Amino acid sequence: MCIAGKNIIFVAGLGGIGLDTNREIVKSGPKNLVILDRIENPAAIAELQAINPNVTVSFYPYDVTVALAESVKLLKTIFAKLKTVDLLVNGAGILDDHQIERTIAVNFTGTVNTTTAIMEFWDKRKGGPGGVIANICSVTGFNSIYQVPVYSASKAAALSFTSSLARLAPITGVTVYSINPGITDTTLVHKFNSWLDVEPRVAEKLLAFPTQTSLACAKNFVRAIEANKNGAIWKLDLNRLDEIEWTKHWDSGI
């Protein structure tokens, strides 16, 4: 996908990997970049606008845990303004295994609901034009960080959901791929809670191993957007972008 001239919605795009990715996206000249996030950050919005004044950067408050109908309502407002949307990035995520219900609600259910909501406008069975979705999952969807099993499971669920949607593209007209960052040096990983406090020093131990910067991850994120490969499972780790070949152990046959 050539980003230039496109209309993009980025969920949770004002911090960490999301903000750095949006810094790279605006350099490529989309027509509109719409950021949905829980907390407004006027300084970040102004910075993105200043990077490329030819891009219209806008913000709408959004919590991915709201009811599906609320997500549809917000997207209806955005589509009424932009007329078309080319790319949706689902980037909401938390890392705190003390918050079991919220971890699942944000990392998995929120992705499902926002995706389901945009199908109201994209699904070709309803006369929609189709579209592209990039879901930010995690390398923990491949192999868990066992001290945070809830987080790891939520990301594995998001990855499975994404892979299923890619298989449905001939029916819906919506193509989908997953973005799976490795351990990235952001505030998210500097302090977090393990499940039942099984490892109080989990963040410290994790950061003892090589990491990548959010900027390096962001640059590879944009490369994945440009590649625009339906069903791709992208690993963004240690400054590299690699497509993962998933090992099939079972097939429904349908």
Swiss-Prot record:
GO biological process, one term: alcohol metabolic process
GO molecular function: alcohol dehydrogenase (NAD+) activity
Protein name as annotated: Alcohol dehydrogenase
Binding site for NAD(+): 10-33
Catalytic reaction(s) noted: a primary alcohol + NAD(+) = an aldehyde + NADH + H(+); a secondary alcohol + NAD(+) = a ketone + NADH + H(+)
Positions that bind substrate: 138
Residue positions of the active site: 151
Keywords: NAD, Oxidoreductase
Taxonomic lineage from the root: Eukaryota, Metazoa, Ecdysozoa, Arthropoda, Hexapoda
Database matches in Gene3D superfamilies: NAD(P)-binding Rossmann-like Domain
InterPro entries registered for this protein in UniProt: ADH_Drosophila-type (IPR002425), NAD(P)-bd_dom_sf (IPR036291), Sc_DH/Rdtase_CS (IPR020904), SDR_fam (IPR002347)
Pfam family, one: adh_short
Membrane spanning stretches: none
Self-association and partners: Homodimer.
Origin superkingdom: Eukaryota
Intrachain S-S bonds: none
Entry similarity comment: Belongs to the short-chain dehydrogenases/reductases (SDR) family.
Protein source organism: Scaptomyza albovittata (Fruit fly)
EC code: 1.1.1.1
CC annotations in GO: cytoplasm
